[in-house]
Amino acid sequence: MAAVTEVVVPADGAEARPLAAEELAAQKREQRLRKFRELHLKRNEARKLNHQEVVEEDKRLKLPANWEAKKARLEWELQEEEKKKECAARGEDYEKVKLLEISAEDAERWERRKKKKNPDLGFSDYAAAQLRQYHRLTKQIKPDMESYERQREKHGEDFFPTSNSLLHGTHVPSSEEIDRMVLDLEKQIEKRDKYSRRRPYNDDADIDYINERNAKFNKKAERFYGKYTAEIKQNLERGTAV
């Protein structure tokens, strides 16, 4: 008797299970690839940002130590210049407008700080007086940022000098700058003449000096110590001094 072979025909559900498993694996693989691409983009972005930070830090290290303070000061001065122009356009006095915006406490604190920073100790010698005048004049110099930007655009990379730069002596001041310098010098000369005018000579006065400088010294000595030496001088004139 011949053997009978049984053939099992798979159902539709059995065929669907391997297909579903393959689709699930493909979806997981696609998710992993997508996540990998996102991580790759984030890594490139982080690398770019780190490079920018390194460049910015290198620039900051090459700047002067007080660069931030200078920058803030220049920005404040630019704002002050803009306010002055606005007041001039309206026909107002900037100093008066500024005083209206400052409280009494701020004004007093500002005066104390100014006196502490640059105290007036009186005349000591000509070198100290000249140094004090130099500091006062340099504080009055206002930066011209428009001219600065024009020169920087004109010279490009050569504007920031190196060991091979040859920019010295090539700058030609404008007529406005020359006029401003002349006006400032005229003001200095006028002020100097006002405070150092020659006193008229009195022929009837007693001559107790050997030159003009000694005469000024004697006047100062008389002003401070005259009341203490008056009796001694009288005794010397009468011949009764001990």
From Swiss-Prot:
Q: Which domain of life is it from?
A: Eukaryota
Pfam families on file: SYF2
Q: Which InterPro entries match?
A: mRNA_splic_SYF2
Record's keyword terms, sorted:
Acetylation, Coiled coil, Isopeptide bond, mRNA processing, mRNA splicing, Nucleus, Spliceosome, Ubl conjugation
**Coiled-coil region:** 65-91
This entry carries the following GO cellular component terms, namely: catalytic step 2 spliceosome; nuclear speck; nucleus; post-mRNA release spliceosomal complex; Prp19 complex; U2-type catalytic step 2 spliceosome
On this chain, the residues bearing N-acetylalanine are A2
Q: Which GO terms describe its biological process?
A: embryonic organ development; gastrulation; in utero embryonic development; mitotic G2 DNA damage checkpoint signaling; mRNA splicing, via spliceosome; positive regulation of cell population proliferation
Q: Could you tell me where this protein is found in the cell? A: Nucleus
Cross-link Glycyl lysine isopeptide (Lys-Gly) (interchain with G-Cter in SUMO2) - where?
Answer: K142, K233
Q: How does it assemble?
A: Identified in the spliceosome C complex. Interacts with CCNDBP1.
Describe the family membership recorded for this protein in Swiss-Prot or TrEMBL. Belongs to the SYF2 family.
Q: What does this protein do?
A: Involved in pre-mRNA splicing as component of the spliceosome.
Protein name (database record): Pre-mRNA-splicing factor SYF2
Q: Can you name the source organism?
A: Rattus norvegicus
Q: Which gene encodes it?
A: Syf2
